[in-house]
């Protein structure tokens, strides 16, 4: 499947505990169909102490399914993403709601 959501994209959460919140994608896991979004889906993990790292309870982002996030367009509203092939043969992402090219 083509990468409709990519690293650096601003997304909004559609369902779940963080519904309506926005954040920036800092990692995409295409094989699992998930992404990590900064400040979204925070969970507490027990960290074992090592020589380099202090032990204790840390808060970090957990993966969120790509079907539960939507790209936020320039107008600040969530939009679906499609693809368009330009005249020079380059494939670019396009916002379905406005038709604006996202990259390229």
Swiss-Prot record:
GO terms for molecular function: rRNA binding; structural constituent of ribosome. Part of the 50S ribosomal subunit. Belongs to the universal ribosomal protein uL24 family. GO terms for cellular component: ribonucleoprotein complex; ribosome. One of two assembly initiator proteins, it binds directly to the 5'-end of the 23S rRNA, where it nucleates assembly of the 50S subunit. One of the proteins that surrounds the polypeptide exit tunnel on the outside of the subunit. Transmembrane segments: none annotated. Keywords: Ribonucleoprotein, Ribosomal protein, RNA-binding, rRNA-binding. SMART domains: KOW. This is Large ribosomal subunit protein uL24. GO terms for biological process: translation. It holds the Pfam family ribosomal_L24. It comes from Bradyrhizobium sp. (strain ORS 278). It comes from the Bacteria. CDD domains: KOW_RPL26. Gene3D superfamilies: 2.30.30.30.
């Amino acid at each position: 499947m083509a990468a409709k959501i990519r690293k650096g994209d601003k997304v909004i959460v559609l369902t779940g505990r963080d519904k309506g919140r926005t954040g920036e994608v800092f990692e995409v896991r295409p094989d699992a169909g998930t992404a990590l979004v900064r400040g979204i889906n925070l969970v507490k993990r027990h960290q074992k102490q090592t020589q380099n790292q202090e032990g204790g309870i840390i808060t970090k982002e957990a993966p969120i399914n790509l079907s539960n996030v939507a790209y936020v367009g320039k107008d600040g509203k969530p939009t679906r993403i499609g693809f368009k092939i330009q005249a020079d043969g380059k494939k670019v992402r396009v916002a379905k709601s406005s038709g604006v090219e996202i990259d390229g």
